[in-house]
Amino acid sequence: MSSKQEPVILGKIGSSYGIKGWLKITTYTDSVEGIFDYSPWLIKEQGEWREVKVAQWRFQGKAVVACLEGVSTRDEAQALTNCEIAVPADQMQDLPEDEFYWRDLIGCEVINTKGYNMGTVQEIVETGSNDVLLVKANAKDGFGKAERMIPFVTDQFIQKVDLAAKQILVDWDPDF
């Protein structure tokens, strides 16, 4: 990976909450409060990332709200509505060898055990029982597929993930 990695998006700022600069936070982390384990945040305003710190946060029903340092009015909060929340990639914890961040799998080439190039991972869908790779097939797919959905079940369908080569080896029939 390059030394200048893209920030990792962990959530998004929603609408303002109250009149004292609080913001509703949409989080993409496993637990709702997990986004607050990271500091500082980067928020993207008008295409540029800038660093911010969370002054306070709390649960509001099933959601969370936060107050950022330097944001103390409703107008200042409203100006941040829909900004993405990210952290530098180097803040992400190292995972065990057999676990992967979704962001690292997106863009990987998917090849089956017979050598057929199934396409490229476009996104990953959380289904409850297991994650599913949404693979966009190559333009001239020999089986007439536009996309494939392959369950991310290691040792059953996922045989090997090589992040350095950006390839995922699967035991999957290309006609599915």
Swiss-Prot record:
It holds the Pfam family PRC_RimM. It comes from Shewanella pealeana (strain ATCC 700345 / ANG-SQ1). GO terms for cellular component: cytoplasm; ribosome. The keyword Membrane does not apply. Disulfide bonds: none annotated. GO terms for molecular function: ribosome binding. Residues 97-176 form the PRC barrel domain. One of its GO terms (biological process) is rRNA processing. Belongs to the RimM family. Binds ribosomal protein uS19. Keywords: Chaperone, Cytoplasm, Ribosome biogenesis, rRNA processing. It comes from the Bacteria. This is Ribosome maturation factor RimM. Its main location: cytoplasm. The PRC barrel domain binds ribosomal protein uS19. InterPro entries: PRC_barrel-like_sf (IPR011033), PRC_RimM (IPR056792), RimM (IPR011961), RimM_N (IPR002676), RimM_N_sf (IPR036976), Transl_B-barrel_sf (IPR009000). It is found in: Cytoplasm. An accessory protein needed during the final step in the assembly of 30S ribosomal subunit, possibly for assembly of the head region. Essential for efficient processing of 16S rRNA. May be needed both before and after RbfA during the maturation of 16S rRNA. It has affinity for free ribosomal 30S subunits but not for 70S ribosomes.
